[in-house]
Amino acid sequence: MRVIGLAVVFILRLAFASAAETQQPAKIPRLGYLVVAPLSETPSPERAAFLAGLRELGWIEGKTITIEYRSAKWNIEDLAEELVRMEVDIIVAAGSGAPLSAARRATSKIPIVMTLASDPVGAGLVKSLTRPGGNVTGGSSMTPELGSKRLELLKEVVPRVAHLAVLWTPAATFELRATRAAAHKLGLTLKLMEVRNADDLARAFAVLEKQRPDALTMLFDALTTGYRGLVADFAKKHKLPTVFGAREFAEAGGLMSYAPDIAEGFRRAAIYADKILKGAKPADLPVEQPTKFELVINLKTAKALGLTIPQTLLLRADHVIE
């Protein structure tokens, strides 16, 4: 009987141990969120869209997922390396340019989800849009038609445009190619001015004051977005119509913007994160190109420039700033 009793105790202990193991909480994944722009307690529209996308898929911050936010204007490389040392399960590069480049240099193993890459193939981030082939996937902000569409909109508002100044950074090479092709088709002459920092921008302004183009555009990336207020103010002061590749430029005082819905891009990034956290490999997840676009027109700026926006264009606008 003693032997039977010991056997029963042993079996019960095994059962309790097994039950305890099954009751152990599952490992909560950690997501690194890398961004240039300063973070505030109130999420930006883009971050809010990303978090909403996660919630729709069952990922609740602080409960089913931990998010490590890292934001810096100058030491983004160090912060990307810090996320790698923390062994996060995935990194979301919020925005194009610096966050994505820093994350890619920091790791070739941890999955990286991009949100606004303008030319992921040309930048060497992925092998192709259909088969990325590495640890990076996500959304691209560009389609070949965008460059021509923006210039067509500009011509619709200002038919006399013949000379267009283009401020661009190396991160916007794909968009620059598309803009060049569109300008050639429309018979526009381009004045290309590379901007890598505030000093370059000041020099560009000095040149534009002397050369006086008919209109101005600044190609979109994380760096140029930070200068949107300066560019919009300069353009208004010198009566230059503008068209941009992000609604933030129009909201800052630019004449108009035509761009992918950025918040939608961040919501889609949450879908990529969900798939990867559930076992999918970035190498096998095709890169998405935008399908939803927004036309934003700033009527206050139009009035300041003495321009009349055609009613047909106003009716097509997704958002009009009055």
Regions found by a protein language model. Name each.
Residues 1-322:
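Short hydrophobic alpha-helices and adjacent helix-cap/hinge residues
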